């Protein structure tokens, strides 16, 4: 019986993450910069740079070092992903509140904001500005991580942050860590196999540990032959189509389905939505459907407990259930020859997000013109505009409002709903009426302006002549 069976429930990247600062390998220079910065906070001396930006390749220890410092200095760590909290409102509400939080049972609070280079400056307008505002007033240290900190839109963050570079890990360091894990797990391993895994990781220790666990869990030992068979080169992430194929087409080994979901390019909740919508498209037998949905439901339960209870060791059960659990649920029928479908839930969420963004932009436009807050516009003005745009018998009225305030087509659609095309036509008609039936060419417009100026000048001269002929009797009235 393989010895790994008793410990395979916990991902080794979690089980063996550094508990102390000295456990983080090959990052001595980063430690020399970051540890004194944290000590200044703990001693009540707020540094000039209230945020730190850690940058370097994936899997080199950026997050691990912050976790180790928090553990060693007895700090409460609030970890957020910038990809999830990237809009202005999210950052002000979530990150802003965390920046003022006080810990009841520990020495202090540290905020870890992962993947700030994942913020989209076009889609998430205002996110960087909101983050800068939070950094200026924060009462707690803010640590951000990025793989590429030199993107143009991150320049304001670089200027206010302590920049800490993390070096790529060497082959020697990765092999040493893998060797220690094998010894702790009492796994038989070949040095050449560990070196092979380390080479394929391309300096990513986290990926190397995942590959080591995949080999050890599948066979109970780590040999060069097994490593070559299983580790096919570093795949940072597996695209969704390959992930679904590995799940629904029942791989030869359970670990293959598990690896497919654990290294998928999609996050856990999105991946569950993909699998959920495609189970009935691939499985036809009722008993197979029951087992697959049951496994996926249990995966959802464990994911919820991991996220909201903070017990991330349960993540291993999530991988087992939505990977091998769904794959081996098919015991009777064949895989149906139907195409994968895009999850309806994700499609609806994308549409709702677009509606929310349009609503925010509309509120911002109206707030500037009406000298009101955006909140007041949303609660007091938008309901009235909704009624006018959707209930007005004459589409000219809402069309004139839209033109007056410079509303875009999406904003009109938000307010008008099914009457969008009717009001857009009315807007075009009003525009033509304002400009005349034929839009003026530049030369014609110039000639018209000269004519209008000449008419105004002639009017002024006539007025002066009339005033000269007016005597005192005019003002005193007839005697």
Curated annotation (Swiss-Prot):
<dbReference type="Pfam" id="PF00004">
    <property type="entry name" value="AAA"/>
</dbReference>
<keyword id="KW-0235">DNA replication</keyword>
<dbReference type="InterPro" id="IPR003593">
    <property type="entry name" value="AAA+_ATPase"/>
</dbReference>
<feature type="compositionally biased region" description="Basic and acidic residues">
    <location>
        <begin position="435"/>
        <end position="461"/>
    </location>
</feature>
<feature type="region of interest" description="Disordered">
    <location>
        <begin position="435"/>
        <end position="479"/>
    </location>
</feature>
<dbReference type="GO" id="GO:0006260">
    <property type="term" value="P:DNA replication"/>
</dbReference>
<dbReference type="InterPro" id="IPR027417">
    <property type="entry name" value="P-loop_NTPase"/>
</dbReference>
<comment type="subunit">
    <text>Heteromultimer composed of small subunits (RfcS) and large subunits (RfcL).</text>
</comment>
<keyword id="KW-0067">ATP-binding</keyword>
<protein>
    <recommendedName>
        <fullName>Replication factor C large subunit</fullName>
    </recommendedName>
</protein>
<dbReference type="GO" id="GO:0003689">
    <property type="term" value="F:DNA clamp loader activity"/>
</dbReference>
<dbReference type="InterPro" id="IPR003959">
    <property type="entry name" value="ATPase_AAA_core"/>
</dbReference>
<dbReference type="GO" id="GO:0005524">
    <property type="term" value="F:ATP binding"/>
</dbReference>
<dbReference type="Pfam" id="PF21960">
    <property type="entry name" value="RCF1-5-like_lid"/>
</dbReference>
<keyword id="KW-0547">Nucleotide-binding</keyword>
<dbReference type="GO" id="GO:0016887">
    <property type="term" value="F:ATP hydrolysis activity"/>
</dbReference>
<feature type="binding site">
    <location>
        <begin position="56"/>
        <end position="63"/>
    </location>
    <ligand>
        <name>ATP</name>
    </ligand>
</feature>
<comment type="function">
    <text>Part of the RFC clamp loader complex which loads the PCNA sliding clamp onto DNA.</text>
</comment>
<dbReference type="InterPro" id="IPR023935">
    <property type="entry name" value="Rep_factor-C_lsu"/>
</dbReference>
<dbReference type="InterPro" id="IPR047854">
    <property type="entry name" value="RFC_lid"/>
</dbReference>
<comment type="similarity">
    <text>Belongs to the activator 1 small subunits family. RfcL subfamily.</text>
</comment>
């Amino acid at each position: 019986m393989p010895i790994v069976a008793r410990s395979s429930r916990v991902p080794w990247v979690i089980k063996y993450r550094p508990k102390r600062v000295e456990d983080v390998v090959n990052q001595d220079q980063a430690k020399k910069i970051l540890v004194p910065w944290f000590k200044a906070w703990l001693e009540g001396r707020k540094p000039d740079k209230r945020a730190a930006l850690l940058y370097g390749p994936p899997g080199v220890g950026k997050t691990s070092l912050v976790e180790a410092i928090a553990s060693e200095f007895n700090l409460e760590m609030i970890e957020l992903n910038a990809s999830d909290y990237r809009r202005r409102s999210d950052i002000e509400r979530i990150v802003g509140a965390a920046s003022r939080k006080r810990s009841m049972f520990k020495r202090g609070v540290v905020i870890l904001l992962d993947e700030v280079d994942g913020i989209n400056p076009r889609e998430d307008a205002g996110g960087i500005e909101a983050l800068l505002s939070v950094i200026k007033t924060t009462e707690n240290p803010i640590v951000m991580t990025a793989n590429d900190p030199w993107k143009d839109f991150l320049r304001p963050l670089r200027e206010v942050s302590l920049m800490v570079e993390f070096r790529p890990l060497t082959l020697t360091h990765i092999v040493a860590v893998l060797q220690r894990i094998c010894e702790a797990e009492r796994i038989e391993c070949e040095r050449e196999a560990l070196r092979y895994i380390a080479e394929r990781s391309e300096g990513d220790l986290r990926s190397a540990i995942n590959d080591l666990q995949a080999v050890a869990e599948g066979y109970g030992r780590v040999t060069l032959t097994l490593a070559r068979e299983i580790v096919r080169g570093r795949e940072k992430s597996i695209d969704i189509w390959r992930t679904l194929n590995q799940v629904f087409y029942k791989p030869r080994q359970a670990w293959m389905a598990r690896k497919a979901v654990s290294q998928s390019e999609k996050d856990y909740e999105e991946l569950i939505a993909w699998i959920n919508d495609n189970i009935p498209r691939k499985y036809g037998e009722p008993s197979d459907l029951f087992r697959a949905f049951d496994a996926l439901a249990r995966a959802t339960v464990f994911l919820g407990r991991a996220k909201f209870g903070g017990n991330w060791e349960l993540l291993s059960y999530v991988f087992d259930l939505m990977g091998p659990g769904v794959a081996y649920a098919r015991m009777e029928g064949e895989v149906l020859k139907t195409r994968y479908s895009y999850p309806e839930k994700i499609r609806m969420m994308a549409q709702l997000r677009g509606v929310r963004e349009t609503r925010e932009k509309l509120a911002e436009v109206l707030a500037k013109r009406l000298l009101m807050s955006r909140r007041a516009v949303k609660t007091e003005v938008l309901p009235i505009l909704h009624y006018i745009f959707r209930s007005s018998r004459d589409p000219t009225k809402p069309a004139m409002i839209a033109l007056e305030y410079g509303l875009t087509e999406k904003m009109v659609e938000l307010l008008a709903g099914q009457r969008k095309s009717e009001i857009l036509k009315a807007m075009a008609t009003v525009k033509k009426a304002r400009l005349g039936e034929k839009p003026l060419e530049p030369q014609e417009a110039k000639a018209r302006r000269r004519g209008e100026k000449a008419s105004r000048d002639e009017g002024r001269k006539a007025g002066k002549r009339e005033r000269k002929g007016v005597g005192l009797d005019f003002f005193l009235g007839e005697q």
